Amino acid sequence: MRYSPAPAALYIRNRKRLTQKLKSNSLALFNSNDIMPTNADGTMAFRQNNNLLYLSGVDQEESILILCPDFPDKRYREVLFLRETSEQIAIWEGHKLTREEARHLSGVETVLWLSEFPKLFHHLMAMGGVLQVYLDTNEHYRADVVVETRNARFIDWCQKQYPLHTYERAAPLLAELRAVKQPEEIKQLQKACDITNLAFRRVLSFVNPGVKEYEIEAEFIHEFIRQGSRGFAYTPIIASGANACVLHYIENDQACKPGDVLLLDVGAEYGNYNADMTRCVPVSGRFTKRQKDVYQAVLRVMRGAMKLLRPGALYFEYHREVQRLMETELLKLKLIDKTDIKNQTKEKPVVAKYFMHGTGHHLGLDVHDVGNMYHKIVEGMVWTVEPGIYIREEKLGIRLENNVVIGKSGLLDLMKNIPLEAEEIEDLMNAR
């Protein structure tokens, strides 16, 4: 394993917090993700079901976790099932978790091979007084699930085998729990941000006119993997010039031109936790006056947004306050005038022409992490703060983004060590 996993105490605590939310006489079950195919016999890199990972720390395919907190025999209140390894598997695929390793990793005492699952599952359902079965689905508000998952196949099988049980949704419970980060999770997120910092500093000494966007992408991935990350937390955006005005530009195939500003929206993954950073740098090493004016405007909005982001705030009200900060800056930049402000509507705010996306999102095991955007922001949540100004007619896009932990009396900025001031970025680029 290239990353240091969180201690078992985290997963023990997470399971306890979940079981406290279950109804009496319940069973909850979580499957690992499938290994997804590409073409022929090719497969994508395995990525674990984050709910299973959150509850067990097990980062391996063909795994199942059962929680049955009211079962009479304490041995079976928590059971973890693993794929049984063999000499052939070890030769062809490498090491798989032993039962003892899984116990140490997860804190689950009863670890069995997957072949034992059918018999024990039936025993729990028949003899455990189980009334409710909590099953796992992807209910993220942005999800568009078109591929049948391992969890979906199990739901279909389970409901056919046990049609008279009551079925409950595990996803809302996990979303509520995962939205508030534990100290061990914040440590992993900080590590992802620290790796991102190292890579960004490397890139500052590399960017020059004529460099291809994908060459910059290569510099990031080199440093990420060198530092123990498995790579990018999401598809990177390396957008020079007019490309920065395309919010999800991912081709990364153009040359950086003299005088352009380069937008970098990248983050490292570490231990399945994710960083999400955006910085903008001058390709030639110095911002023009206009570029710096726009940069400073975005930076002021970012800092103003951080002051507004606090426990008890509601995201959509917070975002509207940030839009008002942006109005002031767009006026100063002469991108809008007072007539534009007077004629705007709630449905079509004047800032939307130049700032058309949200101010932030939950961050954690998922880049756009689970959590209800309509619920109040609470202490322990991790959010991105990412205002931007996109001036297509000037081929200029500036977005700045940091990751912050919501505290009782202020924010913990996980990216405080990543260069942000325009002058610091210029100095680092010209010190090479």
Whereabouts are the PLM-identified features?
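Active-site neighborhoods and metal-handling regions in enzymes and metal-associated proteins
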Residues: 1-432
